[in-house]
């Protein structure tokens, strides 16, 4: 019982923080659509949303979300110690821990997720362009990778489900 409450609390926080940082479920679903439309004729937006919801319901995904967003928020407030403060605040390209954390999300649905993640990280469509816009004054060093990873994992899930139907 107590364990259930704790789990709900983590999911609530993860979803609340995504929203507060400017990311809606439909923004991530748009990325899934972008990744999958060429492989599934008649792909529906509601299927993309449903798969994002499934990914968001996983505890390991929620853990990655609250950890990454927490670090972004603290960096934005200048509350981390050096050298980590500067590394995260400036999104230093050699840091790489943001991507490692995102891999824990991509991993949930197997290896095809990595291809999707790499592709979307290069293209930066939709919400990813917004999250990478440094002129907003926001620190999204972790969040951009997390959002790309959720989209990649949801795409893998959708592809697996479609393969099972065929
Ligand atoms: Mg990053």
Where are the model-predicted features located?
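Plant-biased recognition of short, low-complexity, intrinsically disordered N-terminal tails
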Residues: 1-6
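N-terminal interaction modules that seed assembly of large macromolecular complexes
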Residues: 7-72
């Amino acid at each position: 019982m107590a364990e259930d409450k704790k789990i709900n609390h983590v999911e609530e926080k993860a979803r609340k923080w995504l929203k507060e940082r400017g990311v809606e479920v439909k923004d991530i679903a748009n990325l899934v659509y972008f990744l999958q439309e060429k492989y599934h004729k008649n792909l529906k937006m509601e299927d993309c949303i449903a798969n994002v919801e499934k990914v968001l319901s996983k505890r390991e995904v929620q853990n990655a979300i609250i950890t990454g967003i927490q670090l972004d928020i603290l960096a934005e407030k200048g509350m981390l110690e050096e050298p980590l403060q500067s590394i995260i605040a400036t999104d230093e390209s050699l840091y790489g821990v943001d991507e490692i954390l995102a891999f824990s999300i991509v991993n949930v649905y197997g290896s095809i997720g990595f291809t999707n993640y790499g592709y979307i990280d290069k293209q930066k469509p939709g919400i990813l362009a917004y999250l990478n816009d440094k002129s907003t004054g926001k620190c999204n060093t972790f969040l951009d990778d997390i959002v790309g990873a959720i989209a990649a994992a949801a795409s893998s899930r959708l592809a697996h489900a479609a393969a099972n139907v065929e």
